[in-house]
Amino acid sequence: ATSRNAYNKDLYMWTSNNRLYGYDLSPILIKSNLFGSRMAGDFMYVNNTVYRPAQDCLQGYGKGIILYKVEDISDKSYNETKVISLYPDSSSYYSDGLHTINFYKSICVIDGYKNHYIPFQKIYRKLFDKYRSWISCLLVY
């Protein structure tokens, strides 16, 4: 987990005997770097091998995904090896970043994003917030 004040840089291990609560911070600092500290999804289990997806935040939030192979994990140690980095194609619609990858059975979900410049965005947001209830009534009818 990354702490709120770590700016996506410090990744620590937390341990518990219960999956739902009672986690304690381990003294192990897994990584202290904007490249690969912030998680990009759940751990993946493929052919008895564990992989950890992480974000590349060197140039900003979630510019790409790094996949690490977990070599060793215990209460006292953690070791991983980089397998591959994934970045969006500059000509794709979501060209500004990839920040999530998850698998479930035969389904893979990858989340990307594109920053759009919207002229007068602040004015639009203020008007929308001011008249939100009125607009909602129009949409219902």
State the predicted function of each range.
Residues A1-Y141:
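Carbohydrate-active catalytic/glycan-binding domains of CAZyme proteins
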